[in-house]
């Protein structure tokens, strides 16, 4: 199966590359070089992730890049295979959102050896000593602390806290958890239950089903992405509970579907991420690291805490 997946990926890469080269064969100016940005697009778990990918492609094209997009499944193995394929094709730079933060040492060194810089987007990776960190993301811990504060201000802390944890070993999950806990500790609270939903809507629903006997203890739900929050709201609706009244929900992301629920009063607080700015910063960074590949590069996009009452910069 692994060999089949690898062969299928290489075939896909070859087809995409041939189409790309056909486009490059007819530039407006003879022999003009069009820089190529490789983007590893991982299967999206919600509309916010889909919009993020679209914004990244659009920003890259607006900055003069030809985009070579590699869609992959939600596994680190698939991401690494795609990165390696793009290294072989000698794109100017590669942008990707790593599912987890460890396990990238070998491919980082391979990229450096081939002079193809890797830019981690949204989530961070653990660097290696001889490869500089190049990352565009968000200050998740600060956002989480402020979002949790905003949630606790809406109702006096009196109930338990359920955390719908994202992907284990992912930087965003760790930092959101840290920020939320810091805010809770200031109020003398702790996370009552923390269960891993791997960022999936179906798991958000399943976790609440597993917790049915304990839901009366829960007053707050912290969902680390849109998808799990949507799954939790789905379950609450289908079992006669009222999100926004019986349980206050805080989620991190801010896609269209989640914002629609907030307008209906069913999601109390959103830790919103500016994916448009993230995409612009990524395209800017890709231009710069293509010229100076092995210099450290870190930039953070804006975030905001959204409540029904208004918006506060995080």
Language-model segments: residues:
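Hinge/cleft segment of the Venus flytrap/periplasmic-binding protein
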Residues: 17, 21-23, 168, 254, ...
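Extracytoplasmic "Venus flytrap"
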Residues: 36-59, 68-85, 89, 98-101, ...
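Periplasmic-binding protein-like
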Residues: 38-40, 90-98, 117-121, 162-163, ...
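Short, solvent-exposed amphipathic alpha-helices that sit
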Residues: 48-65, 143-147, 171-190, 203, ...
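Structural motif
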Residues: 68-90, 193-215, 229-231
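Hydrophobic alpha-helical segments within soluble ligand-binding/sensing domains
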Residues: 79, 135-161, 203-205, 254-258, ...
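Hydrophobic alpha-helical
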Residues: 96-112, 180, 198-259
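Flexible loop/hinge segments that line or gate small-molecule binding clefts
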Residues: 102-142, 255-263
């Amino acid at each position: 199966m692994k060999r089949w997946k690898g062969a299928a990926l290489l075939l896909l890469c070859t087809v995409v590359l041939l189409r790309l080269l056909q486009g490059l064969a007819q530039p407006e100016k003879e022999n003009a070089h069009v820089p190529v940005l490789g983007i590893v697009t991982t299967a999206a778990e919600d509309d916010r992730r889909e919009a993020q990918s679209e914004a990244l492609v659009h920003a890259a094209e607006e900055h003069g890049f030809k985009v070579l997009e590699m869609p992959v499944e939600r596994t680190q193995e698939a991401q690494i295979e795609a990165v390696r394929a793009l290294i072989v094709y000698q794109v100017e730079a590669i942008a990707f959102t790593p599912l987890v933060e460890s396990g990238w040492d070998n491919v980082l060194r391979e990229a450096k050896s081939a002079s193809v810089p890797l830019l981690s987007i949204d989530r961070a990776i653990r660097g290696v000593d001889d490869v500089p960190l190049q990352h565009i993301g968000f200050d998740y811990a600060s956002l989480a602390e402020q979002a949790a504060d905003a949630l606790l201000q809406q109702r006096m802390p009196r109930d338990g806290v359920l955390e719908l944890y994202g992907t284990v070993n992912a930087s965003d999950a760790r930092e959101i958890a840290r920020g939320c806990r810091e805010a809770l500790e200031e109020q003398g609270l702790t996370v009552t239950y923390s269960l891993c939903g791997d960022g999936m809507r179906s798991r958000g629903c399943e976790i609440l089903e597993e917790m049915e006997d304990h839901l009366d203890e829960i007053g707050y739900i912290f969902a680390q992405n849109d998808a799990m929050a949507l799954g939790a709201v789905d379950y609450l609706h289908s079992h006669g509970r009222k999100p926004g009244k019986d349980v206050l929900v805080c989620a991190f992301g801010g896609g269209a579907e989640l914002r629609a629920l907030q307008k209906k009063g069913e999601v109390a607080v959103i830790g919103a991420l500016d994916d448009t700015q993230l995409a612009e910063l990524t395209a800017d960074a890709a231009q710069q690291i293509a010229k100076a590949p092995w210099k450290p590069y870190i930039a953070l996009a804006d975030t905001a805490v959204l409540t029904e009452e208004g918006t506060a910069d995080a």
